[in-house]
From Swiss-Prot:
It comes from the Eukaryota. The gene is rpc82. Residues 273-282 have a biased composition (Acidic residues). One of its GO terms (biological process) is DNA-templated transcription. Residues 131-164, 249-282, 381-412 are annotated as: Disordered. It is found in: Nucleus. DNA-dependent RNA polymerase catalyzes the transcription of DNA into RNA using the four ribonucleoside triphosphates as substrates. Specific core component of RNA polymerase III which synthesizes small RNAs, such as 5S rRNA and tRNAs. This is DNA-directed RNA polymerase III subunit rpc3. Pfam families: HTH_9, POLR3C_WHD, RNA_pol_Rpc82.
Length: 623
């Protein structure tokens, strides 16, 4: 990620969110990589007290890694954390997702943790913005409808029973931890992966267990042991004890009848039962035990990437399958999400053709059948399975009419079969969204992550090619992707395009970096007349080129936003005054109101464009 445009983007994000001082230190650390404090003082030309205070704050927000080298006399090195800086751009998307999944108060808690970088539970207990919501809200039930303003009343008459209900902070923290959206902060989180690996390898090689090993056997042992110890050091999982039968504790199954008038946000929110635990307990009983007050938590961006990736997979299903099949797929992805910690094990971007298959955890069909809304119509979207018998007059017999008792008996037996049929539909080409597995005679369904991530990348590249060069270029791209390297004559025969149009399209795509030309001489003379020219499409090269172009476009959007804010600095300071904010029509003239509306529209356009470009980055790099 440490390219010129990526570094420029991260520096702009840090400066926009934390100010010029943080941006100056971050850009210096990225430019010179690992630096000691005296060296950083000389390069930034800041006072020591100011630099130390800034470094402490940046370490708290995980923008800076530090490592103390004991073998060098306790010298501390500092380095920039590019990934944490980039995730600043995804914070709004994450908060929107958490609010959709767990409610508005959970999004407020997550926003507070993001704002602090990491926080102790005891400190979160003291924050007024989290306590005030607890006294105004009636509970924290997943999937709860947001009430209109003025209807969020306290639990009791005139607030006399507010203390009877536990505060919402600890149940919400448990819900966030159960879903994996927050993790425990470990000491290794403040160090870079390279420093952690170096420290672990040094520790292993100095141990007694490797003294008798040599050569290849020693290297294999060190690599294997390093991977295990690194995973253990970075493990901040808090889901232990909060997951029951594969789903977070306290999550209840949705009881909608499938004919409700809820908005799309509520329809997309599926809740799960605790499984086979049928005790009708008060849901607050589990939440009466507070989280450990000394526990320090932070946002788990890797887990949230998994959730956002599953949302993209669901969009593929919604575009190509019936709504009922897409809803079943959502249940399957939700189950898989709870047991998937990160999108992929390797940090580097996998090359095309070199990444192997990576299947999700298998989800039993019986577990899905318990999760899915019993009122969801599954048979209607599949169509009739058999043709009803008619009598000689062409009419249905009396026995073919609907019998409620028979339907009740058949519904239980056929529902699992119907769910299996919907998932089988999603497994068929061209969707290929699911995979069926048999384990000891039990039907399990999985998702092949690498195949779907590759499909998302190809669809994104095809969309860009079609938008830039037209549908003819898209046809040529698909031919080259399917057939490999082709000469111009063979490419023309397959694509059924005139030579003139084909050459124009190929020249344009070559300039854009999507296709390239390989020269294969027939003899040692290498004469042009004795050379074969093969056109080919390299998806890895196209992806890398698109990544750099996208980083550059995002940087330009942020720079333009910064310029526009500077141009309207005095006016925006006036609109952000505490007495003016919310009462603009009282304090601003008509011209100023028009100017404010114009600015907000321009700001929304630029920020929306950055968010759209971030979706492309996620597909090309993170998924």
């Amino acid at each position: 990620m440490a390219s010129q445009y990526a570094a420029e983007l991260c520096m702009l994000l840090v400066e926009d969110n934390f100010g010029e001082l943080f941006g100056r230190i971050f850009s210096t650390l990225h430019r010179y990589e690992r630096l000691t404090l005296p060296r950083l003082l000389g390069l930034t030309r800041l006072s020591e007290n100011r630099l130390r205070a800034a470094l402490v704050a940046m370490i708290q927000h995980h923008l800076v890694h530090f490592y103390t080298a004991v073998e060098e006399g306790g010298v501390t090195y500092y380095s920039a954390n590019m990934q944490a800086a980039y995730y600043l751009i995804r914070s709004g998307k994450i908060l929107e997702f958490v609010e959709d999944r767990l409610g508005k108060y959970a999004a407020t808690v997550m926003s507070t943790i993001m704002y602090l970088g990491h926080a102790q539970v005891s400190h979160l207990d003291t924050l007024p913005e989290l306590r005030s919501d607890a006294s105004k809200t009636n509970g924290v039930n997943e999937g709860e409808h947001d009430r209109p303003e003025g209807e969020n009343e306290t639990n009791g008459t005139n607030g006399e029973h507010v203390s009877d209900q536990p505060a919402l902070l600890h149940p919400t923290l448990k819900a966030l931890a159960g879903h994996g959206y927050i993790v425990r902060v470990r000491e290794a989180h403040f160090q870079s992966i390279a420093d952690n690996i170096l420290n672990i390898e040094r520790q292993i090689r100095s141990g007694d267990s490797v003294q008798s090993m040599k050569g290849k056997k020693l290297e294999e042992f060190v690599v294997e042991k390093t991977a295990d110890m690194l995973k253990e050091r970075l493990d901040g999982d808090l889901t232990r004890g909060l997951i029951v039968n594969g789903v977070p504790r306290g999550v209840k199954r949705s009881q909608t009848n499938g004919v409700s008038d809820d908005n799309e946000t509520e329809k997309a929110r599926f809740d799960y039962d605790d499984g086979e635990d049928e005790d009708e307990e008060n849901e607050w009983l589990d939440d009466e035990v507070p989280m450990e007050s000394s526990l320090t938590v932070r946002v788990n961006y890797e887990k949230l990437d998994v959730a956002l990736r599953n949302r993209r997979f669901l969009e593929l299903a919604e575009r190509g399958a019936p709504p009922e099949s897409a809803q079943i797929y959502d249940y399957l992805l939700r189950r898989i999400e709870y047991q998937t910690s990160k999108c992929r094990d390797a940090s580097e971007i996998p090359r095309e053709g070199e990444e192997g298959e990576q299947y999700s955890v298998p989800i039993p069909l019986s577990a899905l059948a318990r999760d899915i809304d019993p009122y969801l119509d599954l048979a209607g979207s599949l169509g009739p399975t058999n043709t009803p018998a008619n009598n000689r007059l062409g009419k249905r017999t009396f026995d073919d009419t609907v019998d409620d008792n028979d339907d009740d008996h058949g519904a239980t037996g056929n529902r699992t079969y119907e769910i299996d049929q919907h998932l089988s539909l999603l497994a068929q080409p061209p969707l290929n969204l699911t995979s069926k597995r048999l384990n000891g005679g039990i039907i399990n369904w999985t998702v092949e992550f690498r195949h779907l991530a590759r499909k998302l990348r190809h669809l994104e590249l095809e969309r860009i090619v079609e938008a830039r060069y037209g549908d003819v270029a898209l046809r040529v791209l698909r031919v080259l992707q399917a057939k490999g390297k082709l000469d111009e004559k063979r490419l023309q025969e397959i694509s059924l395009l005139p030579f003139k149009d084909l050459r124009q399209v190929l020249a344009s795509m070559q300039t854009g970096g999507f296709v390239d030309l390989q020269e294969v001489p027939r003899d040692a003379q290498r004469q042009p007349s004795r050379t074969i020219y093969l056109w080919y499409y390299d998806p890895d090269r196209a992806r890398d080129s698109m990544l750099q172009d996208t980083y550059k476009a995002m940087s330009r959007c942020l720079q333009r936003l910064k310029f526009e804010r500077g141009r309207l600095k005095d006016f925006l300071e006036k609109t952000e005054r505490s007495d003016v904010k919310g009462n603009e029509e009282l304090y601003l003239s008509e011209g100023e109101l028009d100017r404010l509306r114009e600015w907000r529209a321009k700001e929304a356009l630029l920020i929306g464009e950055v968010a759209r470009l971030d979706d492309m980055i996620a597909v090309m790099r993170d998924y």
